[in-house]
């Protein structure tokens, strides 16, 4: 394969990934692995070296004939020039450039790049994949538990690559300066704005970006490869020397120097590695003293002037002497050149005094750990000796983990093997401190910086352990380790700097509950109480000691002291002293340690607060009043925030009360304690919901406290922790209901106002200055807003209406009104509507997308933008619930309207959003961002914006069109589309593995398609349809649109096509179902159908592959379905749903292909569904298993709905009926929101527990029992929901199958042979008929579908009758038996008690098809002559024995009491049955007499007649029903037993009125033929009336009726006379004969 192919290295990468995922049993043979590796040896040995441009290759290229892919090709001048451009750009052989350009041309459209840009992409991609393979290879060979054969094979192969002459290590080392120079040249070229020798056809910015990122990544990967080669002992001394020479040439700071340091460390470890001999002696493994001496001289004894950076010399030197000393202490025979004092100790001391620990922090820690990130709390006390600032682009996390792992190894070795040096360092620092204290040498006005290596070592340890929390756990788990011993040894120091550094180390080691418990226990030993600070210095620290220190400083630094006098408490103003720097650092360290411990464990925090001797809350607030540096005061506020971090209930309320009281009563605001009053910032009048003065002095005092930026951030974080609801139930306010009631309106409104005004001010500053500080403050404010919005339990409002007072009784003080009026979310929502606030939110959303995508963007900006998106999403979500489920029921809920006034008086936030066009564009861009934190919020906001139902309970499709127009017309529209494509393609592999997680993008698109009805919508634009506002689609082939291979639509099809590779894929992920639903919807939508189907057809056999790949449910699965878990049932549902979508797509395509006559595709589809090319069918009805694929899809008919739960889960103590809104006759499309149900029951149980008697243990035991019941309830509800979905999916699948079957029968019969067609029809009937015969309530939906299928296909099954001759009828016994079985099944289905009207309507239609067909063929050519053979056969099919009384009961009830088609068909069938045979007719008349049916039918039919006449409806609307009824009445009237029941005076009146009405419409010849036929039927009845009833009887009964009869006669005669001179239709001839007969009868009666 060509090296420029994107899949060139894929096979090797796959093998290596398989081995790495399971190294002990990789299921990969070593032989196969070596064969694969050997095929890449040439690439590895060549490494990144390129054949340079040369004259011979240039001459061949310019000749116009070039060998590409083993074939000689003629190339044009443009191709030659582009190849030369690449050659100049990359300094690459011209022929190779031609091959590379060919690959670029092939992929340029898919990549949406020019051919040269695409070629550059493949060039750098090949290099990246080569290095990735080598990195994986060297990493795998170093795995500890690697299978032995694989390990041996890999080591042998790598050894061959590293041999002399083919030295991979040397090649890597030599490549580093080459790449370094290239990076420098690229940066210079970018600064200069031009590239020497590059043709203008190459996009300058594209090349700069691609080449710079590629070369930087290559440097990092090579450093990893070298490190891993050194770890597996494939590094030689010469390689070490080469790297050492390279290191000497680097300045500080230099990224490459930092990258190669781990390799040098790894080599030193291998050189100094020891081995244990059988006699228990230990010796050097390499056993080469000369090498050790040479390394020592090169690192330690080399002159400083040989190093451009002494810092790197010291960093490498301290590592060398530490490891060398460790080795010397383990081996028995120490090398002769080593003298501990001179070689190790003195060298180490010199390096340490030169500041190596500080340099390690500056050069190896700071580049990977920003000061504002968590884990850098110790940085405030660290003084770096170097003024170097490191500003690198982000480095791979794996490299950072390598560096910190090596640093940790160094620190552990230094503590274990250099304890004497540590003791010396400590003693020197103590001596220096005592000397400086006794004899200060500083000159007034001059500050001399002093550095203490022992303290710097503590800070180095802090920086190392905070990198990886698991290392902290390892530290505390091993109390026998040297590191733990070093920690306990350090506790006894009395030097301020050491105390500070040691305390900060402890704070850094406190990152989880276990470490917090360990530190708490370590400091919990009792200590005698002392009175002054000097006495405190003689003891080891404890919590009592620390709080005594706090109280000591309170007594000396608080400006106003509270004293006890004879008249009570009084305040005494004092002159507070100043705190020195060392004391301030100690105080800050102690506060930080306390903060770290209480933050990790709520129980420890509670224990602290319950200790009246310590009283931390009051102590911290008193400390806050002292005259302290700002950094200490900020640390105090952070300590309060740590106390609030996990606080709940009364503890949280106590913190709120203390804070509120402190702001009102604190001496800080009575006496100027260093805080000047802060002026109110200039804020828009609409930025706050209330005037500033309305908040009283409390808000002013908050402003005075938070003058400093860091103080503002810390205070807002404190408010966030106090406000955040930590309870799972989230049903009560997180502050006391009466907070501040004695001096203001109770609640936390001043704090909300402060956060809002702070957010507005910081937003303005960010907009103007773009400083990081303001963005950090914005982030803190946004976190507070999120905590407030999340804390509003909207479920209380929802369930309050459903469950009435039961919810309200469980609220704090049983008052929902108080909960709503005091909850800060309501006032915050109102504030969010002010222009200055939502402008700040939108400004964050509109932050430059390119800046966000830059790898150097600060993380703070990213998380702040993400937080703003979360708030916008939460507001839209909250409003949706309020508008839809709360506002309409405010009166019912008992909520005052003014509480939720904002939801009524203000427009929806959705409308606010729609006015920010640029925000919507940026929001859509964020979907495609590399920062995954934006995706969910951005997608959900777009979902709310396109949702037309959730806001104000009204649909407004224009908003969906507006949103689509905004994005479609934006300059970034194409970029947005590509962003959606990239995000989907980067996610789908992950979603495939999760199986039950949906794609947010596909969910948005699917919902939008359904809501918009497939017309002009955002979903169509994103999928790649170029649609105009007039709903016209243009098929474009540009990338991004469906006409190109680069579009989201084609990505979906690629994704779906991948599923067809393996047959019988059981685990159908949700994302696959979503993709199929979208494509199926596009196929069925009239606007997109043609384009979508053409795209599918462009993929040969895709639909056929999808059909073939669909799995079939096994009998075992069907039998066990009732016992499946909810996850297993969902898996079956997804499988069935995917099948449904495939059948829907296929049905749409078949219908389209049949309509345009594309028989080629029809043949393919028919062959896949009916398998005409795989099975030889006989002409007889086979009893074997069906060979039709489409019938295999009906495996779902074997599922018994009774095995799936229809009833509600019944668990004692749970009344689930109150959560139901729709639940009808056991069939349910209602699903439970399991999470909400569990929440409300937890609320009930906790409230009930508080009222229980007994001990705390008994209450807890009772609650545990209830929780176990809740778990069972959750499982039952989830299973119930899964069953509901499964039944819906089964019904959907049946409907799709019925449609597809109908299309095959109706549209494809011409492309199916008669044999196959007949066999298919009867196979379908045999499959579905048994289910129709006997069904129950649970199978009604299934039978409704299958009975419609029978009605559709039965006429086709009967078509052979027309081809049979009478003499052939007796020989086709199998055919007649089949029809007989169908009739029996239909009759039984009609009689079934659980059949509804729709089912019976289908069955009547099927039965009528049979009756109609046989009626046609029992009359020869439509005449009166009856074929006795056919009639005899027909009478044998339907005998009186089949027509039971139960069947007649159902049939006559439908004829009497139903409407529409069911009534019409039942009447027609009754009429037909009278003509089947005299026996059946006699049987029917006897039944009529027993049930008095005829009179009842006449009454029902007369009522229908009367309604028609009174409503003035058009006769044509009900014509078919009238005809059916009239035919049956004619039949009744022709029988002497029922004629008198038919010819009632009421019916005669209605009949005469109808005839008069028809005569009024003009001449009879102008009536439409169907109406003429109805008139014929009426005239037949009229003649029977005149023949059976005398005019005298009519006159005696109703003289008006008699007059109407004579009037009707004249009208009829006039109508007939009017058209006498015209050619008459058969209907008119019949009417004319009947009119003449009527005239003669009337004349006869007159005579």
From Swiss-Prot:
GO biological process, one term: nuclear pore organization
Gene Ontology MF terms in the entry: structural constituent of nuclear pore
InterPro entries registered for this protein in UniProt: Nup186/Nup192/Nup205 (IPR021827)
Keywords: Cytoplasm, Nucleus, Transport
Subcellular location: Cytoplasm; Nucleus
One Pfam family this sequence matches: Nup192
GO CC field: cytosol; nuclear envelope; nuclear periphery; nuclear pore; nuclear pore inner ring; nucleus
Function: Functions as a component of the nuclear pore complex (NPC). NPC components, collectively referred to as nucleoporins (NUPs), can play the role of both NPC structural components and of docking or interaction partners for transiently associated nuclear transport factors. Active directional transport is assured by both, a Phe-Gly (FG) repeat affinity gradient for these transport factors across the NPC and a transport cofactor concentration gradient across the nuclear envelope.
PANTHER family to which the protein is assigned, alphabetical: NUCLEAR PORE COMPLEX PROTEIN NUP205 (PTHR31344:SF0)
Annotated family: Belongs to the NUP186/NUP192/NUP205 family.
Protein name: Nucleoporin nup186
